[in-house]
Amino acid sequence: MRKYVIPNMRLGATSFLLHETYVPAVRFAAERCDDVALLLVEPGERNEYLATPGEIVEIGRIIAGERATLHVHLPTDADFDTWEGARSMIGKIRRVAELTGPLDPHSFVLHVDFPSLHGTGGEPSAEQQEWTAEALREIAACLPAPERLAV
């Protein structure tokens, strides 16, 4: 398959273009685009929805073979409303970072969320800001390079 070409731009796509498991979905995107977003947004309670180590190896082969780049979207199934939620998020992200590290993603995208503030127009409290800043420091420290964290 020939990649889509847009002059002076790199075309990107998510690993959810197909309703498929990780490997065929990444293959589909990498065959067509320059950059693939590996979406690992809901790992599950026991990481049962994450790609397996074998799938990660195959994803690495696909990305290299297609000369594509890759970035990872980190879990979103926890939040920063409470310190407990932030701690849960750190644990999930640490597991994803360990799993995907061999892929050498150029960035790890984190969506910082405060569900208690949805629709209120409110800002995070000073306490929420404090534990979020601490969580972000811990998250950045578990990545292959802290500057790869994109918030």
Where do the model's predicted regions map?
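Active-site acidic/histidine proton-transfer and metal-coordination neighborhood
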Residues: 64, 81-151
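N-terminal pre-domain/capping segments
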Residues: 1-95
